[in-house]
Amino acid sequence: MAHKKGVGSSRNGRDSDGQRLGCKKFGGEAVKAGNIIYRQHGTKIHPGNNVGLGKDYTLFALIEGVVKFERMGRDRKKVSVYPAN
């Protein structure tokens, strides 16, 4: 007979770090060209005026200006950058 108790191993105990998705610049905030506005998987938010779409669906400013979130119809959203006056 074993004189030490068998120790079971847990199959849990793993949790990956979050991917830091979401809004990086909010409506009304000033941005420079190249600033990341929104990180996402898929087009949760679409690119509007003066906003580029990266290959990983990151939205970024193409010009210096102010961020504005807008609606495209009833169920879609877009983000645009307009020059600050």
UniProtKB/Swiss-Prot annotation:
Entry annotated with the keyword Ribosomal protein: yes
- Record's superkingdom? Bacteria
According to the UniProt entry, its GO molecular function terms are: structural constituent of ribosome
Keyword terms of this UniProt record: Ribonucleoprotein, Ribosomal protein
Q: Does the keyword Ribosomal protein apply?
A: yes
GO biological process per UniProt: translation
Please give the InterPro entries that the UniProt record associates with this protein.
Answer: Ribosomal_bL27 (IPR001684)
A single GO cellular-component term from the record reads:
cytosolic large ribosomal subunit
**Per the record, which residues fall in region Disordered?**
1-21
Say which family it is in: Belongs to the bacterial ribosomal protein bL27 family.
NCBIfam families for the chain: L27
Quote the protein name from its UniProt record: Large ribosomal subunit protein bL27
Provenance organism: Geobacter sp. (strain M21)
Lineage, highest ranks first: Bacteria, Pseudomonadati, Thermodesulfobacteriota, Desulfuromonadia, Geobacterales
